Amino acid sequence: MPFCQVVVGPPGSGKSTYCFGMYQLLSAIGRSSIIVNLDPANDFIKYPCAIDIRKVLDVEMIQKDYDLGPNGALIYAMEAIEYHVEWLLKELKKHRDSYVIFDCPGQVELFTNHNSLQKIIKTLEKELDYRPVSVQLVDAYCCTNPSAYVSALLVCLKGMLQLDMPHVNILSKADLLCTYGTLPMKLDFFTEVQDLSYLAPLLDRDKRLQRYSDLNKAICELVEDFNLVSFEVVAVENKASMLRVLRKIDQAGGYAYGSTEIGGDAVWVNAVRQGGDPLQGISPQERWIDKKEEYDKYEWELEQKSTMDEDENEG
């Protein structure tokens, strides 16, 4: 029963960086994993790529041959993957014992409106018994701008409904939050997505948005009515935050409650089942803004102690 992450999000949200960071983390805890690049327009891949869609699809050639723009070419490419999904199935069968991370294109409509990505993943579920979790990244910078945050909420909600699978939303680049100045609300407000009516006065301060006051209010009410969207907070370079989000993903997809034979990381799975997060109960505001340096040091000391304990046990 293979498990996978389907990593989506708008351009600049840090998808490829996250994929590489997650791959490194999984390797560190002993879980066999691979990254699959599904973005034919991704020209700067820094991670080891087990399956690369660019080997069979050239987005520049698609633009030239079919007189399409960049967005149209990506839609065409995704439809081509869907139509020729047997190629992807064949490649994935070579890695049946690996946990898979899919790095998807950043074109928003591919995971909010278009059906090809969803159909591809559904085919993997049916043919290879995959257990996917959609991981949607949003740049934490949106928390500095209420209108950008409302837009991110709507994209996340639409993505969750469109992809129709277990879903984890992430505010990425959390380590930069302390450099943005004072946020309009505490970070906890943005992660919990509760009482969005408090955003209305902030949105109305911008004269350009006052004419859209009713629309913004309706969007906030819509998000609250569904009560589906919330965010985890991640800094890829911070191992502890990546471990926390992996714990959430494993719980969402069922990895933490199933067999450990595929991943080979029984120690990690048992830890997830038992809990044990040393910073459990610490608010995102406190961790990433109010006392960031203090908790950075604390987590570093914990990691050093853990490394020393492992060395002693091996000795």
Swiss-Prot record:
Its main location: cytoplasm. GO terms for biological process: protein import into nucleus. It is an enzyme of class 3 (hydrolase). GO terms for cellular component: cytoplasm; cytosol; nucleus. A motif (Gly-Pro-Asn (GPN)-loop) lies at residues 69-71. It is found in: Cytoplasm; Nucleus. Belongs to the GPN-loop GTPase family. Small GTPase required for proper nuclear import of RNA polymerase II and III (RNAPII and RNAPIII). May act at an RNAP assembly step prior to nuclear import. This is GPN-loop GTPase 2. It comes from Schizosaccharomyces pombe (strain 972 / ATCC 24843) (Fission yeast).
